[in-house]
Amino acid sequence: MAETSDCRDRTTEPAPTCAFVLGGGGALGACEVGMLRALLEAGIKPDLVVGTSVGAINGAVVAADPTVEAAEQLAGLWAGLGRSGVFSGSMFGRLQVAARSRTHLYSSAPLRRLLEAHLPPGVDRIEQLPVPYQCVAASIERAAEHWFSRGPLVDAVLASCAVPGLLAPVKVGDEHFLDGGLANSIPVGRAVALGARTVYVLQVGRIEQPLSVPRLPWEVAAVAFEIARRHRYARDMADLPPGVEVHLLPSGGPVGRCGTAGQLRYRDFGLSGERIDRAYRATAAYLADA
């Protein structure tokens, strides 16, 4: 059984008041780096970080060091995602991996190395992070969302990022896990359940735009996933208790027609710098007016 968590974990710590919620979104997750920089420059620091998929990566780095310098380090990590081989290689190489594994196209080893290189030395477990941190993955055996609040940090982040078909399911304990976005893509409800009263939602821009009717067969899956993730987020927002304030931070621009094949371009890291800058400017302006 994997090391689990519930809302009573870390009870020796005071209840959080300010949470950063970092959603999933593949290559579009670079937007969250700009948002983090704007938040930290404004003096807004979290006492709880929860993340899903690529948001688990960004969240782990900021939970390890909630400073502007950490946001700048994250920008370097995102530059590395395009060069590290996480989603690179020839079509022949990907077919070789698929033939051996029969379940996925890429090895998770490059992503593991990149994470280990960008996390502080000596921070191996979630409990060692200065800011309480949780990330979510989807348990295959239990068909349920699973929250990691303790245990090996990199393993938990890899589990949250295990995109079906691209990366192998990650085994932690006796369970196997897939990408947390399958279960809870923008986990506002988790932050509120843990006691947060002010929640900053860092998302990649999709929920800012209406969905489009699919035009091509492969767009149907993208639209279906968007409906599921937006429904969960809308339900969390509708269930907010009195006194909880939620800030949905702006991404700074369109991400393309929602529900199209472009949404599935998981290797499109070439625009990371532009996405970071755009989200930074939009979020800084939002915070100045808040």
How would you label these PLM feature ranges?
Residues M1-T52, A60-A290:
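Patatin-like phospholipase
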